[in-house]
Amino acid sequence: MKAWLQSSISYYTGTAEPVYGPEAIQPVTASVQGINPFHRLEADDFKWSTPSSSHVETQVFYIKPNEGDYMCFVQLIHSNLGSWTTTAQSTCRIFDLKHPENDLWTSTNMDQFSFENDKTSFVAKNCSVVLEDQKRYRIRASINMDSIIDITVHQDAPPFKIGEDGNSTYGTDPSKPWASMKHTFWPRTRVEGSIVARGRVVDVTGPGMFVHALQNGKPHHLASSWEFALLQHKKFTAIMMQFKTPPSYGSTIVNIGGIAMKDKIISATVDNTIEHVETTLDPDTEWHEPTRISYEWDGKDAETYTEDIHLSVDAPLGRRLQRIDVLAEIPSWLKGFVHGVSGTKPFIYQYFSPVKFTLKMGDEVIEDEATLFNETTFIS
């Protein structure tokens, strides 16, 4: 029991970090100030990294089906934290936006997993996520009979990263970083196929977005909070990802994003802002969750980097889709102990809302309606 407890605490808290200051993080945004941050992916960017050290690596496929009133995502999680064994997990979520009682959530650990095709594809017992020609993913999974997945995700707009390698690095010596953070995006995808949800076939054919993310280090050492936004319109897609470091790295904010139109990238953006305009206290968690939120994407065109691009959204949030207790899988007595030791109290809030946006491209101004899927994550 003592050994298990010690390893559990190590897993969730790690060792306390000294205050290194903001000089100990090298944000990817700093590397592209004054230059075009847009970079197409190279061959290595399509591969799973699978570092041997503590990490969490994920692939998430977001889908807004044409039929019905749903919002979906399929996620793969590969992790190795502290002294725990490397694990792989699949999650599937179908939000029924009109009838929340029909929402589906499955989370399943996977066995006999490996990385194939030069680490561009993931294979496990009754599950495969295969990259084909760097243009599409073929996803088949029957590891959980409540969510049988058979979809193909096609790339519609060029995938991209911020900067030459996409990495924000951590360490007092930039030439020898001890941790890193990276995101690559397929901002506009076209999904074909279905998910059998508790015996009911859900046609999930429709537009989507894909992100591949790596937290190469203990997650709560790298970030104390997260924000994510996915704005979807019939012609445009905008994405934004922001994290804030713990005080050990100066509470530094790193925000990256991009705007795509049909089959091209309009802009990769790093001078973005997020504001929780209005909040309410969640008495169950003691976090102030947003009820109205503002997003500002600010950059220049991806092709010539001469034309100003700006997109703004300021809207009340619609239905809270889900509140995820990240530590839900551990015993309640240990959860309280972990929180007391480390101050870690991670919860993810997810929302879906109809919104209005304003997009300025040089002298052209476009105002229209779209849908917003967003997440706010509090860690510590």
Curated annotation (Swiss-Prot):
Single Gene Ontology MF annotation: ceramide binding
Primary location group: Golgi
Bilayer disposition of the protein: Peripheral membrane protein
Entry superkingdom: Eukaryota
Gene3D superfamilies in UniProt: AttH-like domain
GO BP annotations listed: ER to Golgi ceramide transport; response to oxidative stress; sphingolipid biosynthetic process
SUPFAM superfamilies xrefs: AttH-like
Membrane-spanning residues: none
GO cellular component: cis-Golgi network membrane; cytoplasm; cytosol; endoplasmic reticulum membrane; nucleus
One Pfam family here: Svf1_C
Keywords carried by this UniProt record: Cytoplasm, Endoplasmic reticulum, Golgi apparatus, Lipid transport, Membrane, Nucleus, Transport
Family of the protein in this entry: Belongs to the SVF1 family.
Cited function: Ceramide-binding protein that may transfer ceramides from the endoplasmic reticulum membrane to the cis-Golgi network membrane, and is thereby required for the biosynthesis of complex sphingolipids.
PANTHER family linked: CERAMIDE-BINDING PROTEIN SVF1-RELATED, SVF1-LIKE PROTEIN YDR222W-RELATED
Entry protein name: Ceramide-binding protein svf1
